[in-house]
């Protein structure tokens, strides 16, 4: 029998991608609370490899709002796709209550793409930011929205809620974008990040890149340059892992030393912060990336509003 093409063979995960699961009481308690409050986390939906570290050790979580069904079907992502559910207008308060119960110092709020909504879900997204801040003035808030089809007024709605970090992922290099990302456009992502920075220059912007999909090193560096040209402050780089056999295959597993080199290059290119490693995901160690001066200002503002009520 002829040998299978190298890219078609099943690639065995290297040792550095094998992690020890930690399912202590903190982890199981958080999982129970999420179900009781009918909340979704991208940690579970996207099968993040860091879920046990974040939930059991760091006690952080990334909430996924606007339902758990995405209107897009990106070929790298494990989140369910199809016809989405109706908006849950009580969701912002439930997220805020959960953040308070967990005692979080930093929360990431992401969402499925809601291309069925005129504003892409921006109004509910913004209200979730405000609700979390009302109950948790010193909890820093990072948002990770879809591109909302490039709707500038939707972006303005979200930015005016004053998150502490605006995160929007480039995901892959320009050449691979049509293959990897459903309905998304490379240049629209760059424009989204540029406009966010123009609207509120003091709010750090952030993006994430997966590697292992067949990109070249030169393409990775070009993507870094494109992000910096649009004033993106923070970059995360992680290994793509195939969620199921229906998703894109892994072409290459990068060695930790290669990630260390990419991080060094990113810092030389002017990013204020870069996390790079095999298990790094967009929200990894996000609490270390905030602008503390902006955090304190937003907290004082929230406390003042509470006192006036």
Swiss-Prot record:
Binding site residues for [4Fe-4S] cluster 2: 70, 74, 77
Pfam families xref list: LIAS_N (PF16881), Radical_SAM (PF04055)
Keywords, comma-separated and alphabetical: 4Fe-4S, Cytoplasm, Iron, Iron-sulfur, Metal-binding, S-adenosyl-L-methionine, Transferase
Any GO MF annotation of the entry: metal ion binding
Pathway annotation: Protein modification; protein lipoylation via endogenous pathway; protein N(6)-(lipoyl)lysine from octanoyl-[acyl-carrier-protein]
Gene3D superfamilies according to UniProt: Aldolase class I (3.20.20.70)
Reactions the enzyme catalyzes: [[Fe-S] cluster scaffold protein carrying a second [4Fe-4S](2+) cluster] + N(6)-octanoyl-L-lysyl-[protein] + 2 oxidized [2Fe-2S]-[ferredoxin] + 2 S-adenosyl-L-methionine + 4 H(+) = [[Fe-S] cluster scaffold protein] + N(6)-[(R)-dihydrolipoyl]-L-lysyl-[protein] + 4 Fe(3+) + 2 hydrogen sulfide + 2 5'-deoxyadenosine + 2 L-methionine + 2 reduced [2Fe-2S]-[ferredoxin]
Taxonomic superkingdom: Bacteria
Name of the molecule in the record: Lipoyl synthase
